[in-house]
Amino acid sequence: MFEVTVSKRLLKSGIIVSAMTLISRVLGLVRDVVVANLMGAGASADVFFFANRIPNFLRRLFAEGAFSQAFVPVLTEYHASGDINKTRDLIARASGTLGVLVTIVTLIGVLGSGAVTALFGAGWFLDWLNGGPAAGKFELASLLLKITFPYLWFITFVALSGAILNTLGKFAVSSFTPVFLNVMMILCAWYLSPNLEQPEVGLAIGVFLGGLVQFLFQLPFLIKAGVLVRPKWGWKDPGVVKIRTLMIPALFGVSVSQINLLFDSFVASFLQTGSISWLYYSDRLLEFPLGLFGIAIATVILPALSRKHVDAHSDGFAHTMDWGIRMVTFLGIPAMLGLMVLAKPMLMVLFMRGEFTPSDVEQASYSLLAYSSGLLSFMLIKVLAPGYYSRQDTKTPVRYGIIAMVSNIVLNAIFAWFYGYVGLAVATSMSAFLNMALLYRGLHLQGVYHLTRKTVWFVARLAMAGAVMTGALLWQLDTMATWLSWGISQRALTLTGLIGLGVASYLAILLLLGVRLKDLKAATE
């Protein structure tokens, strides 16, 4: 009975988060369509995506990634004590300490944007030093970084607020908040960029304004929940010390994939023009199912696992992990295979207009195919990593994270030499698989979680259904030349039909194999 209650509660929370995330992701795709039409995949696009990736990397490293994974278990522990004053004091001291640190980092980024660009865009910097053809990229990237870097400050507090609200069971607010970034970027792309000599500056301003609006949006909900407090410096506060202790190793453990993506940008700055853009558009399509399913499930599973750990409920902990694994594989397998088969049609329908050419579709499809092969690994990492952080164990995943990161660097050097930017995507996917495998192995060896026979059989049936779905899609898929001969309406209708065919065939085979909705609940074996 317990596992049924857990599954229903988590499923309800997961649906809420997924619904809010869906709105944000759809608007994110609209934003990317607008950006592709405005800039395509040329030099300007490369520079903007570079300038936007660095603060986003730091956001996931400090805010949504390591900080949230360290903060939520500690906050859950304080909240479970029932002492609201103690909880409010922890929030005040954590926000004050984090605020000082992120302000310093933001100032360094803005004032030292040239140095940051030289560090992560070394290829452009060397061209600038030698008066090469990419010298203008370095100067523009430094300018854009000055505008986009303050986004880190805003979004850090957005992530902090979201972690607090999620711990209190209010998942919808934080899941809906990213909508405002997409809205501001779309508005700036439509109304500001066309009136500027450098359109990418308008997009950078959109990033800044998006962060500001997200920050302001969550304040009323914090007030209503009674947790909007005045920040205090608390470096040596016991709660903050515990968060720091958990956070430092988590900087690697939870953000390895982001470090890998940033390293991809570093290597890509030495490659042909368009490489960063092709990788970006591929990553954006990958992020849609990853955010809609993987991150949404991870968002609700971390507080749940933390509560089970505080209550010393080992069975509940395992049931929650099992639910996460089943949901991620049920959704992730068809998403991964669908992206791989429909890479070119999706890129055509979404991005091929304005400055984004058929050649860009061809190039981006190769990196999307490579990235997509790692989608299930990325999603499983989002579920497996909280299995450590909820127990306040950050040292184990950091070891695995370092191994995966080093493997990515080595594989980058090998594959980029032979396959260019596509090799970077292949290396990222392979290192993600390694990280995922190590995380599961660690949980198994610690006796915390192991796959039951029922879950293994469940996943095997998902794989069989996915194989049939892939065959059905390939059977109906026309050549790229045929797709190019169609208008946008026919492309969109055909893609919609193919997606419908994929979903229908996947679910039909699952039904024939005996899979039912009740199988998505945690195994009790």
Curated annotation (Swiss-Prot):
| CDD domains xref list | MATE_MurJ_like
| InterPro entries on file | Lipid_II_flippase_MurJ/MviN, MurJ
GO biological process annotations for this chain's record? cell wall organization; lipid translocation; lipid-linked peptidoglycan transport; peptidoglycan biosynthetic process; regulation of cell shape
GO terms for cellular component: plasma membrane
Q: Which pathway does this polypeptide act in?
A: Cell wall biogenesis; peptidoglycan biosynthesis
Which molecular function terms from Gene Ontology are attached? lipid-linked peptidoglycan transporter activity
Location in or out of the cell: Cell inner membrane
Which keywords belong to this entry? Answer: Cell inner membrane, Cell membrane, Cell shape, Cell wall biogenesis/degradation, Membrane, Peptidoglycan synthesis, Transmembrane, Transmembrane helix, Transport
So where does this one cross the membrane?
A: 10-30, 32-52, 100-120, 140-160, 171-191, 203-223, 247-267, 285-305, 330-350, 368-388, 402-422, 423-443, 455-475, 495-515
- What membrane topology is given? Multi-pass membrane protein
Known role: Involved in peptidoglycan biosynthesis. Transports lipid-linked peptidoglycan precursors from the inner to the outer leaflet of the cytoplasmic membrane.
Protein family (similarity comment): Belongs to the MurJ/MviN family.
Recorded protein name is Probable lipid II flippase MurJ
- Organism, by scientific name, is Vibrio cholerae serotype O1 (strain ATCC 39315 / El Tor Inaba N16961)
